[in-house]
Amino acid sequence: MNPLIHHATKKFWDAYGKLPLRVQRVADENFQLLKADPFHPSLHFKKVGRYWSVRAGIQYRALGVRHEGAMIWLWIGPHSEYDKLISE
């Protein structure tokens, strides 16, 4: 099986840049784990409606979509905003 290719949108990077540094570090660590083992239980990587969701710390999530064999990361932020996005 080929490894999943990951891309992030400008909107994702803008949101990432607004996160506290400690959350950015956790997100970076979790991204490395995601590339090595996408279904590691600590990541909670799963399909949620039209999105794929992954943990970026206890109170933060990232959302992406699968497109042509790649994962396109669209957003990262607090769980409270995540709940609103996935319910749309």
Q: Language-model segments: which ranges?
A:
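Basic, amphipathic "hinge/linker" alpha-helix immediately C-terminal to the N-terminal HTH DNA-binding motif
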Residues: 8-12
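Hydrophobic alpha-helical segments
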Residues: 23, 34, 49, 69-71
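Secondary-structure boundary motif
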Residues: 18-21, 36
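A short, surface-exposed loop/turn module that caps and links secondary-structure elements
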Residues: 29-56
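Enriched for short, Lys/Arg-rich terminal
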Residues: 1-7, 18, 25, 56-88
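Active-site micro-motifs of SAM-dependent methyltransferase domains
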Residues: 14, 33, 81
